[in-house]
Amino acid sequence: MMEPAIEPLDRVFLQLGPITIYWYGVIIGTGVLIGLWLATRESVRRGLPKETFVDLVLFAVPIAIVCARAYYVLFEWDYYSKHLAEIPKIWQGGLAIHGGLIGAVATGAVFAQVRGLPFWKLADIAAPSIILGQAIGRWGNFMNQEAHGGPVSREFLENLYLPDWIINQMYINGQYWHPTFLYESLWNLVGFCLLLWLRRVNLRRGELFLSYVIWYSLGRFWIEGMRTDSLMLAEHLRMAQVMSITLIIIALVLWMVRRAKGWARERYMD
């Protein structure tokens, strides 16, 4: 039995003459602004100047976007080498979170050095904002009908008690697909709540950020295995899964070494 015609949600948020504003950018921008608001509130509570994270974001966000796009293009070079004009078109999607994180962390490290601020203190304050921003940002993938998993039936999606507007948006090219964007968004939302709880536990400085890295990477490894559009390092070897395992190992090693060497004496609340 053929499905009735299902139209996807309009990707365009606003059209101003020749200027097109897409939902993808609006949603990612919303995630950044909410994250900035949360980080600014917490930074003031932790005794930092109110403008600290505003200044950091002015550098970190553009660099993170460039790195996220460069990372994606690098692993899709067979395509982009023949379509160079499409490389700047980030509104079509194609921002790799791992690339963005590398850019953001590197920027944060330089920023902390220049401002004379403790890097791990900044990282801990930023961690809940980052994962909440990721939870929000995945809905940009939803609007673009990307970052989905393998084929499923409509009945499968209905059994997840999803509203029709989500189910219909997962109908792409005559087939329903796993809403992996939603799985990751929910995973990150749980991670956000977990980090807020861990903040009250008063871990040693840096360990809240490392907890974020471990939590996000565990979820990303699991969910990436369902996706159909993964960046591939080699045949049957998904780059995001390799990065997730690598980041988990690095985070655990840093956690243990910093404690063993006495490099993590200060607490989050200090």
Swiss-Prot record:
Subcellular location: Cell membrane
Alphabetical UniProt keywords: Cell membrane, Membrane, Transferase, Transmembrane, Transmembrane helix
Keyword Ubl conjugation attributed: no
Record-level Gene Ontology MF annotations: phosphatidylglycerol-prolipoprotein diacylglyceryl transferase activity
Domain of life from the UniProt record: Bacteria
EC number of the protein: 2.5.1.145
One Gene Ontology term, aspect cellular component: plasma membrane
Record's bilayer topology term: Multi-pass membrane protein
Primary site of residence: membrane
Transmembrane intervals: 19-39, 56-76, 94-114, 206-226, 237-257
Pathway it works in: Protein modification; lipoprotein biosynthesis (diacylglyceryl transfer)
InterPro entries in UniProt: Lgt (IPR001640)
A Pfam family assignment: LGT
GO biological processes: lipoprotein biosynthetic process
Positions with a binding annotation for a 1,2-diacyl-sn-glycero-3-phospho-(1'-sn-glycerol): 138
Family indicated by similarity: Belongs to the Lgt family.
Role according to the record: Catalyzes the transfer of the diacylglyceryl group from phosphatidylglycerol to the sulfhydryl group of the N-terminal cysteine of a prolipoprotein, the first step in the formation of mature lipoproteins.
PANTHER family the UniProt entry points to: PHOSPHATIDYLGLYCEROL--PROLIPOPROTEIN DIACYLGLYCERYL TRANSFERASE, PROLIPOPROTEIN DIACYLGLYCERYL TRANSFERASE
Protein's name according to its UniProt entry: Phosphatidylglycerol--prolipoprotein diacylglyceryl transferase
Natural source organism: Geobacillus thermodenitrificans (strain NG80-2)
